[in-house]
């Protein structure tokens, strides 16, 4: 079995590494100490296509494989945990569920802008929240109702 990275994987790694060093590293300590959301950095993640890496192109994503996603996450996580968590939640918790279980209308309405990271020129990202009193941090024990 060949575990060597492909040329595409190496390009993703270099792009993620450059982004982390040039865009995330400057100010990372200040953002963390001031508890500031890394808005500028997450907007640039969207520009790079890193907010919908494994989502097919017809749904606004980059259509890349899981290895590409993991490589990019590793490079960004080395420098800025806040930016990498935004990337992780959007890609794996939010987009994955919509891609796997959403109908076509939901994919067009929600998944496409989430995978692109923008809607009408504004940041558009998903979130994951544990706030149910009976569940605590046990997500499988939550009970909720969706309202559109």
Q: What are the functions of these language-model segments?
A:
Residues 1-11:
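Intrinsic disorder at enzyme termini
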């Amino acid at each position: 079995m060949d575990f060597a990275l492909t040329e595409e994987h190496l390009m993703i790694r270099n792009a993620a590494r450059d982004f982390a060093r040039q865009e995330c590293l400057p100010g990372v300590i200040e953002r963390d100490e001031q508890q500031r959301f890394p808005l500028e950095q997450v907007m640039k993640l969207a520009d790079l296509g890193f907010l919908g890496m494994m989502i097919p192109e017809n749904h606004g994503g980059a259509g890349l494989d899981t290895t590409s996603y993991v490589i990019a996450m590793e490079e960004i996580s080395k420098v800025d945990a806040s930016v990498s968590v935004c990337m992780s939640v959007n890609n794996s918790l939010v987009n994955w569920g919509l891609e796997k279980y959403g109908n076509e209308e939901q994919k067009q309405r929600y998944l496409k802008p989430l995978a692109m990271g923008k809607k009408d020129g504004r940041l558009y990202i998903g979130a994951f929240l544990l706030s149910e009193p009976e569940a605590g941090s046990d997500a499988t024990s939550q009970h909720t109702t969706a309202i559109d």
